[in-house]
Amino acid sequence: MTEEVIVIAKWDYTAQQDQELDIKKNERLWLLDDSKTWWRVRNAANRTGYVPSNYVERKNSLKKGSLVKNLKDTLGLGKTRRKTSARDASPTPSTDAEYPANGSGADRIYDLNIPAFVKFAYVAEREDELSLVKGSRVTVMEKCSDGWWRGSYNGQIGWFPSNYVLEEVDEAAAESPSFLSLRKGASLSNGQGSRVLHVVQTLYPFSSVTEEELNFEKGETMEVIEKPENDPEWWKCKNARGQVGLVPKNYVVVLSDGPALHPAHAPQISYTGPSSSGRFAGREWYYGNVTRHQAECALNERGVEGDFLIRDSESSPSDFSVSLKASGKNKHFKVQLVDNVYCIGQRRFHTMDELVEHYKKAPIFTSEHGEKLYLVRALQ
């Protein structure tokens, strides 16, 4: 019989959507699914729902492990079935999701070109899936945090379960101790001699809750030395003082790959300003094709609370995102363009200007404590 996993709420959380669950600090909950960035839990009243995974911690022996992975290990090889395509709407929230979360709740990594070896045969069950032949090699083009990857084989492109393949690396890297330790999910206690994966800069201050986490202030530069396979939302980093610990990956921006550069040669973040091309070229709030990270940096460098910009969506070329400077953590809101109507949550607007003017007068976001956020002015 599989061990029942209990988690304890570290902070209060008030549900923002129907599929979420209210929790109170120190409340005892039963973990039902930890396969995504939000966990599904059950409370003492037998109510179930999703909560942010960093708001709870495991109480018993499966700490830092995956409930789904343990079930798979117990029952043998299994695959996570997608009830919808990774490109379709999903009811599962994500800690990295834009608000309101109308699109997929899964985080995705694009523009990859990684060879992978097929460990097990797989027969496609949907039109957008890819059949795999055991022993063959596929090219991974995209990764989705729901456990499915998109790749190509023999001219065909589609989705397949990621645990059916093994990424390939060059022979020298495969034999290195640092690579082997990362593959095994080994803990690097001091970072000495470990391979530096990225150099990152912190976007916000963070106070550790557990001994294995690392405190940091906004603007610090750190080295990423490990990406734990069983805890993908956290990276193990080493700061300038040599301290090592886990940090939430959505609190940092990648500056470069490899070891840190001398401060005199540190990469500089280029100026990001309004776009002279694109659908809303010339509008002071339209920044065009900039990334979420670029928007974050621009808002943090020269914005004040209420400053905003609108950019093209990274995941849906025809859609847009509103990035808003807020105290603590900036907010990002998905705007979908459907039949020439701009949709944000359940609201619809005929023009983007109409949307902007509406949220200058009505709150675009209300926190669990009743704090209201408005679009005040375009980022200067």
From Swiss-Prot:
Modified sites of kind Phosphothreonine: 92
Entry-annotated residues carrying Phosphotyrosine: 110
Disulfide bonds: none
Keyword terms of this UniProt record: Acetylation, Cytoplasm, Endoplasmic reticulum, Phosphoprotein, Repeat, SH2 domain, SH3 domain, Translation regulation
Modified residues (Phosphoserine): 90, 94
Region (Disordered): 79-102
Limits of the SH2 domain: 285-380
Description of post-translational modifications: Phosphorylated.
Biological-process GO terms, alphabetical: actin filament organization; cell migration; dendritic spine development; ephrin receptor signaling pathway; epidermal growth factor receptor signaling pathway; immunological synapse formation; lamellipodium assembly; negative regulation of cell population proliferation
CDD domains for this protein: SH2_Nck2, SH3_Nck2_1, SH3_Nck2_2, SH3_Nck2_3
Transmembrane regions listed in the UniProt entry: none
Record-listed N-acetylthreonine modification sites: 2
MF GO annotations: cytoskeletal anchor activity; phosphotyrosine residue binding; protein-containing complex binding; receptor tyrosine kinase binding; scaffold protein binding; signaling adaptor activity; signaling receptor complex adaptor activity
Domain SH3 span(s) in chain numbering: 2-61, 111-170, 195-257
Effect in UniProt of substituting residue 148 to K: Abolishes interaction with DOCK1
Main location, first listed in the record: cytoplasm
Keyword Endoplasmic reticulum: yes
Tissue spec: Ubiquitous.
Cell compartment(s), UniProt: Cytoplasm; Endoplasmic reticulum
General function of this protein: Adapter protein which associates with tyrosine-phosphorylated growth factor receptors or their cellular substrates. Maintains low levels of EIF2S1 phosphorylation by promoting its dephosphorylation by PP1. Plays a role in ELK1-dependent transcriptional activation in response to activated Ras signaling.
Subunit details: Interacts with DOCK1, LIMS1 and TGFB1I1. Part of a complex containing PPP1R15B, PP1 and NCK2. Interacts with FASLG. Interacts with AXL. Interacts with PAK1, PKN2 and SOS1. Interacts (via SH2 domain) with EGFR. Interacts (via SH2 domain) with DDR1. Interacts with IRS1.
Protein name (Swiss-Prot/TrEMBL): Cytoplasmic protein NCK2
Source organism: Homo sapiens (Human)
